[in-house]
Amino acid sequence: MKVILKGGLGNQLFQLGLGVLLSRKLNCELEIDVSLLNPLVRGQYNRDVGVFNFALPGVSYSISNDYSSLNLFSRLKRFILNRFYNHFHGFIPSVNSGAGFNILDGYFQSYRYYIDDIAYIKSLFTLRDVHRVEKVSLLEKEIQNSLSYVIHVRRGDYAEDASVASSHLICFPSYYQRLIDSIESEKSDVTWFVFSDDTSWVRNNLSFSSNVVFVSELFLGYPAAPAIEIHLMSFGYAHVISNSTFSWWGAFLKRSDGPVYTP
């Protein structure tokens, strides 16, 4: 089973999670193609292969870099052999059987692919020990030992790239501020743990009355920062997420039964 990774870390987790489940179900080798994470591939952003910063215990896989040849074959399949190539949006129940195909090329952004394997998926995406440096361990304890509200603010290409913004709606400041005000009015001992690709914007546009820790600022320049941040987000009691797969995974992997607030 080949899975073609594309997009940022949140998207990669959806793709790899499904690939692992299907290769396990079919008892076959898993091949992970990373070609589309290469900035030289036309139409693609430069993305890190962040999924390999997670432990993936018990998963056997090989890595390939040959999507350029697959691209031509894909076009032929779409226009000439359409019955072998299906293009869908949303959840595709038949994918869960793994029958009739051996390439996963898409985003597969639905937890319903994992509905019977949630505990297993969570066990896959634990941070590799090599990244659990002292700073990470201390933050784990701080987040676990407080009434921690994780808030993730996604901006980046959503705010800066018009082509991305046209298809990915950015959350308004009022969405975050209403939740911050409501939660702080009900709970006096909240500590906010802020994760964002634009913490300057958060500082200038959102107001907190409670304690605040800007976690993302502590890992600037870390190659594994995205994986570390999702890992730390999972320790939060409650989550305020944005319109982002990165946000979604931080909340999905959480260890508590606290609430998740969504746009």
Annotate the PLM regions.
Residues F14-R24, Y176-I183:
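Histidine-anchored nucleotide/phosphate-binding helix
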Residues C28-L40:
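A short beta-strand-loop structural module common to alpha/beta enzyme folds
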Residues R42-S188:
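Secretory-pathway luminal glycosyltransferase catalytic domains
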